[in-house]
């Protein structure tokens, strides 16, 4: 049993840790306040090869494992959860089905430019009445000559206001099963609606997307067969949960570092507050929780890399890491007391942003049902 990182993994972690410290963290607050998509940093990460880490060299990627990707993504999240959410979408959900199922034209014209940061992708799955309940997805794709006509409403679509193309889940065929389509932003019948004002991740734009008689040619049906979308989605969900856990680790580490630093500098009753047992116990709990969460996330990623069963472990990792991170961010705000409530300190941003990880990829309540089903089978 070896818990050490390989030399390559350590080099990847160090590269993105430096980038986070030198490029992301200094801009994070300003980007957050401006509610501005971090396009320049997005492109810089593309130049570092971030978007191609998980894809094979044959299509312009670097063929790295999920474990390496999680190390890098966690460092990005440590600097900015908004940026981490954007690059996670670009690296997996927004592009995976193009690479996996798209034809040569789609790969050359959209997928490869996306790896370079020249195109931005998003996934359209959630609907006003279909969140955790995928069976309630109501968007339809009706067969016509030469393709399909899509009608429906999607919401909570990450990166939609800046996206160039969308991977859309809609019901098609006689049995109305989920089918995957590619829709480009400029085609008639697609409307990117109002931007949703959120509690956190202010620099990550999220909006509604409407499809009203939107024609999609046969060549843009990504599904090999009508109705195979749910199967592809289930295979991807475990990865989504693991990388969401990795993002939670990043913001938790940032919050713990802020709390430790403040507790060492802040003096009350003639000594630093980290000399008081109440603060020491809180810091100990935060550090222990983070260590345990890190182990769960990286083991789940390793199981995925080894192509071993990992759906239960992915759900456990996401559940524990995100809930633990939320607690760490809350405790950090308590350590800073009034300053944890002040906008000039980053802890308030960590506390707002961490909730993003509690929702994406499945809520904690849904994950518990997944875990219970796995352990009971």
UniProtKB/Swiss-Prot annotation:
The keyword Flavoprotein applies. It is an enzyme of class 1 (oxidoreductase). Belongs to the acyl-CoA dehydrogenase family. The expected physiological substrate of IaaF during indoleacetate degradation is (2-aminobenzyl)malonyl-CoA, which is not available for testing. However, the missing amino group in benzylmalonyl-CoA does not appear crucial for substrate recognition, since the compound is readily accepted by IaaF. This is Benzylmalonyl-CoA dehydrogenase. Homotetramer. Involved in degradation of indoleacetate, the most common member of the auxin class of plant hormones. Catalyzes the irreversible oxidative decarboxylation of (2-aminobenzyl)malonyl-CoA to 2-aminocinnamoyl-CoA and CO(2). In vitro, shows high catalytic efficiency with benzylmalonyl-CoA, a chemical analog of the physiological substrate, but otherwise accepts only a few medium-chain alkylmalonyl-CoA compounds as alternative substrates with low activities. It catalyses: (2-aminobenzyl)malonyl-CoA + O2 + H(+) = (E)-2-aminocinnamoyl-CoA + H2O2 + CO2; benzylmalonyl-CoA + O2 + H(+) = (E)-cinnamoyl-CoA + H2O2 + CO2. Keywords: FAD, Flavoprotein, Oxidoreductase. The gene is iaaF. It comes from Aromatoleum aromaticum (strain DSM 19018 / LMG 30748 / EbN1) (Azoarcus sp. (strain EbN1)). The lineage of its organism: Bacteria, Pseudomonadati, Pseudomonadota, Betaproteobacteria, Rhodocyclales. Its cofactor is FAD.
